[in-house]
Amino acid sequence: MGFINDCFMLKNDEAKRLYHEYAEKMSIIDYHCHLSPEQIANDHVFKNATELFLGGDHYKWRLMRAGGVEEKYITGDADDYDKFAAFASVVPYMIGNPMYHWTHLELKRYFGIDEVLSKDTCRPIWNKVNDCLKKPEFSTKNLILRSGVTVLCTTDDPVDDLKYHRTLKDWSVKVLPTFRPDKI
């Protein structure tokens, strides 16, 4: 068993009771989502682990750069597996950064993977994630629904077209735009 389990970060009996009796069952309001509204509206199916974990995630890119990874493996034209392997090679050095826990929570929660992602575990994790992504329950909307999300706020430029938000207005998850003026 890996370090991510049903009582991860719950250090005493009261914390475990409060979480499992109350918080665990509550819906999630995601105020800062990196999925594009277009991906959600089109129920995008991720082609592989690189697209899912690294596509557009500038936080992971920053950690890869800090770990000395060449840009071609981050936003460049390297092969997708090589990009994922480059990410895996820096994950062990992320201890102390929330991204370390988030990465392993994602692997455990959605893919049942207990192993720590590293250069040594990269290939079997890549294969398992990619096998899962072929199944309908791993489409964008299904991943959101499986997460218990009821409100999801996308990060949008002030001039973005809201057409995809409009197409999602009748979906069970409320998808709202937020103001992110990075390009200004």
Language model regions located:
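Metal-cofactor-binding active-site regions of metalloenzymes
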Residues: G2-I184
